[in-house]
Amino acid sequence: ESFLAELRQVVGHDLDFEIDQYSPPLEARAEGGLYDVIVAVMQRHDPAAPVVPSLSTGGTDAKHIVPRRPGTQVYGFMPYRQQPGLEEMQLIHGHDERTSVDELLFATRVLYDVVINYTNSTETQ
């Protein structure tokens, strides 16, 4: 409802909106804890790669986690670097979905380091 109110401020009240499906929104903090670990790990692996919060308009498995564990911070983190000239974003969920071996190895190293660093940071708290 707050989103609709904000949307009406932008586009006016002359349009009608119909919500076909609704589930409570999920929001994760873009600071502290796991988020800071993700930023630090990405800075080590690729200092030029920004970590940017985004809004996902699709579904997410997080909707099954957060209701069972309120307060859980869930991030759809994908350590992925777009290769120049390659239309990889069009391949996501496509019939010919794929990624390069280099990107798979990069993502594996980054995710491994995120898990190790986050685990180590929570053990010292």
Regions found by a protein language model. Give the residues of each.
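Metal-dependent amide/peptide-bond hydrolase catalytic core
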Residues: 1-125
